[in-house]
A protein has these predicted regions:
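Hydrophobic/aromatic beta-strand patches that form the interior of the parallel beta-sheet core
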Residues: 13, 38, 65-66
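N-terminal anchoring/stem segment of glycosyltransferases
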Residues: 1-33
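Short, glycine/charged-enriched secondary-structure capping and boundary segments
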Residues: 4-5, 52-55
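Short linear motifs at secondary-structure transitions and domain/linker junctions
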Residues: 11-16, 42, 59-61
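Catalytic-site signature of metal-activated, phosphate-bearing donor transferases
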Residues: 54-216
Length: 216
């Protein structure tokens, strides 16, 4: 990130050691001195051609802008793991996660920008591979149940049938487990939101597979 942005006018801030995605996003947005800020996530590798120069439309309602990422385990290209241009005011003033939808970002007005921002390299350990896949497919399955689309159906199919590279077997295990989890809970947001709690996920993983894996 520092290398790619060194000749750009953007100011880079690093946020780490914060528990919970919502709290981490709030911490990052609070460091910004502009109405919007780009958020880049640790499990990604930036596209060197991504210039961080998108201009939000101030005449429209405030929203978040989601850029594409390429999943390096199954080749899907869509917004999951992508850079997000967050409206800082909406992030900082966001209510507790219990009052939001399943996905924090999608709980607010959003616009998808079909520009490749980064490459998702999440399968750095068996647990990391499993966790990312589990969370994504449980979320996609919920979205498909609420508002069916061919895109979501296709993404679910790829997640649960295709994986290559490091820990590809754990990617598939996680994706299929996430689907199974949704099928058991149904569209119950309280139960589904457990998949966004790191402690719950680790306990679920270790209980199901009777092993303790690195959680880093």
């Amino acid at each position: 990130l520092i290398t790619i942005t060194k000749d750009l006018p953007n100011t880079v801030h690093r946020v780490h050691g914060v528990t919970g995605i919502q709290q981490a996003l709030k911490e990052a947005s609070s460091k910004s001195k502009t109405p919007w800020s780009y958020h880049v996530f640790a499990k990604t590798e930036l596209n060197p051609d991504f210039k961080f120069d998108y201009s939000p439309d101030y005449m429209q309602i405030p929203k978040h802008y989601i850029f594409y990422a390429q999943n390096m385990s199954n080749d899907l290209v869509y917004g999951e793991m992508g850079v997000v241009l967050y409206n800082n005011k909406m992030v900082i003033e966001s209510p507790d996660y219990s009052e939001l939808g399943l996905d924090f970002t999608m709980s607010f007005p959003t616009e998808v920008v079909p520009e490749l921002s980064c490459f998702g390299r999440f399968a750095t350990s068996p647990y990391q591979a499993w966790r990312t896949a589990f969370r994504e497919t449980s979320k996609l399955a919920y979205f498909q149940s609420e508002s069916p689309s061919m895109d979501t159906k296709h993404r679910l199919h790829i997640w649960t049938t295709k994986a290559h590279g490091p820990h590809n077997d754990w990617v598939l295990n996680g994706a299929r487990d996430g689907m199974e989890f949704f099928n058991k809970t149904g569209p119950d947001l309280v139960k589904l939101k457990a998949a966004f709690d790191w402690n719950w996920l680790r306990n679920y993983f270790e209980s199901k597979y009777s092993v303790k894996q690195s959680t880093t």
